[in-house]
Design a protein with these regions (language model features):
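Short, solvent-exposed micro-motifs at the edges of structured domains
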Residues: 75, 107-108, 115-117, 121, ...
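Outer-membrane beta-barrel translocator domains and adjoining extracellular loop/strand segments
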Residues: 27-34, 99-107, 161-168
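Membrane-spanning beta-strand positions in outer-membrane beta-barrel proteins
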Residues: 2, 8, 12-18, 85-87, ...
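Extracytoplasmic loops and strand-loop junctions of Gram-negative outer membrane beta-barrel proteins
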Residues: 1, 44, 52-61, 101, ...
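Long, well-ordered mid-to-C-terminal structural blocks that present hydrophobic/aromatic surfaces
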Residues: 90-95, 105-107, 111
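Conserved C-terminal beta-signal and adjacent last beta-strands/turns
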Residues: 71, 77-80, 84-91, 126-188
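Outer membrane beta-barrel strand-and-loop segments of large Gram-negative receptors
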Residues: 19-87, 101
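Transmembrane beta-barrel architecture of outer-membrane proteins
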Residues: 1, 11, 19-25, 35-37, ...
Length: 188
């Protein structure tokens, strides 16, 4: 489900807004890493299968459903100072990803005393829900005249969480500043 609008009241200004809601049933991705070095039940299953040189297994699974909600907004405004062009672009994105269903533990592990509780581990769930900033925004200005141009941009990225089976680490919001000066050598 999505909805959007575009508005251009003049040749020098435009605004777009997009909303979206995406539900995926039986999403396919890599499931939990079933590690035999830390779980004796997994080690026994691997050994019983003749896989004595393998410490763990991971495989694609469709063991979850996900929901993504988001908003994209972009605005562009152009000025005409003298012989040049001055563009301002403001962009904003908010995206929230959520795991809405996880399959239970594979049948081969049920009731065997394994430390695993579902087909997914915290790393996989985190990668979907929190491993990328939930918001991003930028303000860019670009001046050009003839073959010459100058660009400046400030970007803001919201917090995100990275992790492994050893734990999760939260990184706070960050801002980046960048710029560019250019000259076109070929004909305009």
């Amino acid at each position: 489900l999505s909805a959007g609008m575009a508005w251009s009241p003049t040749n020098d200004f435009n605004l777009t807004v997009d909303l979206y809601n995406i539900n995926i049933t039986d999403r396919i991705l890599l499931g939990a890493t079933f590690d035999g070095s830390s779980d004796p039940v997994i080690a026994k299953i691997l050994a019983d299968s003749g896989l004595t040189q393998i410490a763990g297994v991971q495989f694609p699974t469709n063991a979850l459903d996900t929901k993504t909600n988001g908003l994209d907004v972009a605005a562009n405004y152009r000025l005409h100072p003298g012989a040049g062009l001055l563009d301002f672009t403001l962009a904003f994105n908010f995206t929230k990803n959520e795991v809405t269903r996880i399959d239970p533990l594979p049948a081969i592990l049920v009731g065997k005393g394994s430390s695993y509780t579902s087909a997914l581990d915290i790393v996989t769930i985190n990668a979907i829900e929190k491993n990328r900033p939930d918001r991003r925004s930028s303000l860019t200005s670009n001046y050009s005249q003839g073959r010459f141009h100058v660009m400046g941009r400030i970007s803001d990225y919201g917090k995100f969480v990275d992790g492994s089976l050893d734990g999760l680490e939260t990184f706070g919001a960050k801002q980046l500043f960048d710029g560019e000066i250019g000259y076109r050598w070929d004909a305009i």
